[in-house]
């Protein structure tokens, strides 16, 4: 029984104010209660201690979600993480909060797709010809961060979730 949604209401049982992850100490000092819970939850999820399809981070703007996510990622090699957003402007915003340590792309690029328009003038993603699944950016990283997931088409979101689950990737969605 996998849970589909994981919010900020996780009750954690940690000893002290820090956790160890990938041989690095991740301090919870300076975080408020909600941020501490989120960082602890993300770390537990990344370590495989939570049986979830993905880790959902939600909350009002200005509550420190970006700051807390960066704190949780400190225990990972930057090459293991890729961030993606629906549009180029959203990608740039994600890049601003993740910093230069991590690769950030559009969702289309993450999946090796290009943007086109259907007969109604709606933007759609289509698979690029000749793109092998193993060469896609989503396949080269262990942790996938999707920003503004509500802006992504349901079919594309389902494809990302399926790839992450089939290929044992960790998916963090905002």
Segments predicted by a language model, with ranges:
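Conserved ATP-binding/catalytic motifs of P-loop helicase motor domains
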Residues: 1-174
């Amino acid at each position: 029984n996998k849970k589909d949604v994981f919010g900020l209401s996780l009750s954690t049982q940690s000893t002290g104010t820090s956790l160890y992850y990938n041989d690095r100490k991740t301090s919870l000092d300076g975080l408020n209660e909600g941020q501490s819970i989120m960082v602890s939850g993300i770390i537990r999820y990344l370590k495989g201690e939570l049986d979830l399809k993905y880790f959902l981070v939600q909350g009002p703007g200005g509550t420190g979600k970006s700051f807390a996510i960066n704190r949780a990622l400190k225990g990972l090699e930057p090459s293991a993480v890729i961030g993606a957003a629906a549009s180029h402007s959203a990608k740039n915003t994600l890049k601003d909060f993740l910093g230069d340590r991590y690769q950030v792309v559009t969702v289309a690029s993450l999946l090796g797709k290009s943007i086109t328009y259907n007969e109604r003038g709606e933007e759609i993603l289509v698979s690029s010809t000749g793109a092998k699944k193993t060469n896609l950016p989503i396949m080269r990283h262990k942790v996938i961060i999707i920003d503004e997931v509500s802006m992504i088409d349901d079919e594309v979101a389902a494809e990302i979730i399926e790839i992450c689950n089939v290929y044992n990737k960790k998916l963090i969605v905002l």
